[in-house]
Amino acid sequence: MGIVIGKIELNSEKQIIGELKKKIKGINLNVAQKVIMLSGNVASLKGNTLLKSQEKQILEILQSFKGLYDYTYGLKVEALDKIRRLENVYRYIRVIKGYPIKGRTKSNANTAKRQASPGGNKKLKIMDILKKKPTNRKERRIFNKIKKLQDKHNKQQQKNKKSKKWKTKK
């Protein structure tokens, strides 16, 4: 166990410069070297060879740097994990809805929602369209045409039934 800065634990087996640069946001190689030089330590110093007094010096210097007052803010890993988690949630929702994950939804959503079928079983597609709500323009057109045809067919059947009733009464 090396230096513990807030929630950040620096690896004791690696050089402090590399660990500062890797784990604390806002610290690059030059800043890490300056911090260690200001504390009066050697640049190639490893975490397991540090004394408590040297750790305190490094902590004080880090706190004095502008923009690094709150050194717990500098957790790169946690910050990136939060962002990735939110991105993944957003992407997951978009994938479920059938929308493109990023980009234009006015026209791209139509392409994203199309079902690629080899060969083209149109009858199966039409049956699928009738079972669920249409999701894009093409499906809506087909859905509306089929509905109109069904309505016409139903009207004709009703007319035929009425005419048969009249015929039987005569």
From Swiss-Prot:
Q: Does the keyword Nuclease apply?
A: no
Q: InterPro entries, alphabetically?
A: Ribosomal_uS13-like_H2TH (IPR010979)
PROSITE patterns given in the database record: RIBOSOMAL_S13_2 (PS50159)
Q: Where in the cell is it found?
A: Mitochondrion
The primary location reported for this protein is mitochondrion
Of the GO CC terms on this record, one is: ribonucleoprotein complex
Q: Which UniProt keywords apply?
A: Mitochondrion, Ribonucleoprotein, Ribosomal protein, RNA-binding, rRNA-binding
Q: Name the family.
A: Belongs to the universal ribosomal protein uS13 family.
What's one GO MF term for it? rRNA binding
Disordered: where is this region? 130-170
Name-wise, this protein is Small ribosomal subunit protein uS13m
Q: Where is the composition biased (Basic residues)?
A: 132-147, 155-170
